[in-house]
């Protein structure tokens, strides 16, 4: 028989936690993350100021932006941060609510785990609750007419009121709606709204926010390559290239042996002829503007300038795609294959302006632009990046409504309605599952509660009366007025949220809670500093452990 030596299965420098300790650790981590962000919900939300590792400052109240900047160690906290990113990419809104909800779902589950209830029971109750939440949401949702621009502006406005941009809300709403309507693109009955690719936000410090606008076209941060080229062209013919107008060196390395000096001049001549040929291929089509993603040599500039063609070089690929969508040009890879229908004639004006101390090329007044640039002006970089984030959210909200025109009441009203429906359903349930199921209803109330807290009103009194209100008939739209902290019918205030955002918020929050409840063991391998040295001479060592 072996002595009582402990058997080491895991190597010594790994840390292992298991059982209840892990679950409460995960729940606490999730609660901590939720607490950081709790004050960022609603119109009376606070801003957070973060220093990034480079020493720059980020000022924001956008849930996702805050969590992106925070460095966390706990694995559960990392997955919480991940869900806000998913939410942001998927629907663009609800990044703050999803974290608060997930944190609350876990926090109500802690009580059951302490009573030795098995996590699986809690999980199956949560899953049931999620299905009922989704069906209740769909019941209280109302359809919306996407051509009614007042209604659309109202929806975007309720997403913007919680942001820093709320002072210029009508301007921001119009910008967002305009931009999204521009990039909307229907093909064989399939709607495509790609904000990321085709609605670019360009920030130029200086001026005031009221100067911001949506351009019917594209703006790029470039100047002409030669000072004597035209800087103002009406109805330009635009050619887009993604090849360079320079002498092309071969792919493989080549050596040339020169015996006579005429050969040397001949080689130079060949280079010139090649470039001249390239330029002639382009000049044949009589374009006014040539825009390329690569370089343009001095000689090519000279030929183009003599033909009175404006050239712009080293444009980003994404910008080039946008110009193509805006003016109807095709991007060509080989100048010798240029055809008449590759030329873009959809733009009404090309002009190059100097703003501040940089030159910008504007391609505007497009006939039917399918891409646009949003020009933002403002006092400082920090303000501009916050406004940009807010605008992105507004555009996402607008996109969601256009793709799925269903709305649910905002201001905590839909949470209360769903919570009420769940509480009613749980009365008919028997067995252990009814308690966690009812707890989900309780967890949902965190949204209206936080809204009340952020206004500084009395939470208990208002929540009780809101609960009472929801037990009455036809009161599904009663919620909290985030400005004053009083109870209102949000239908009259016009606070609506897209159904898609709410559904995603609930799904993500419950899924995350379920995911973290499933974990009962964390093994973290720590790398010791001396680890690398012991690797080389560490073979005999390993046998002794």
Curated annotation (Swiss-Prot):
Keyword Cytoplasm: yes
MF annotations from Gene Ontology: ATP binding; ATP hydrolysis activity; ATP-dependent protein folding chaperone; unfolded protein binding
Domain of life: Eukaryota
Cited SUPFAM superfamilies: GroEL apical domain-like (SSF52029), GroEL equatorial domain-like (SSF48592), GroEL-intermediate domain like (SSF54849)
Role played: Component of the chaperonin-containing T-complex (TRiC), a molecular chaperone complex that assists the folding of actin, tubulin and other proteins upon ATP hydrolysis. The TRiC complex mediates the folding of WRAP53/TCAB1, thereby regulating telomere maintenance. As part of the TRiC complex may play a role in the assembly of BBSome, a complex involved in ciliogenesis regulating transports vesicles to the cilia.
NCBIfam families: chap_CCT_gamma, thermosome_alpha, thermosome_beta
Protein name listed in UniProt: T-complex protein 1 subunit gamma
Gene source species: Macaca fascicularis (Crab-eating macaque)
Gene coding for it: CCT3
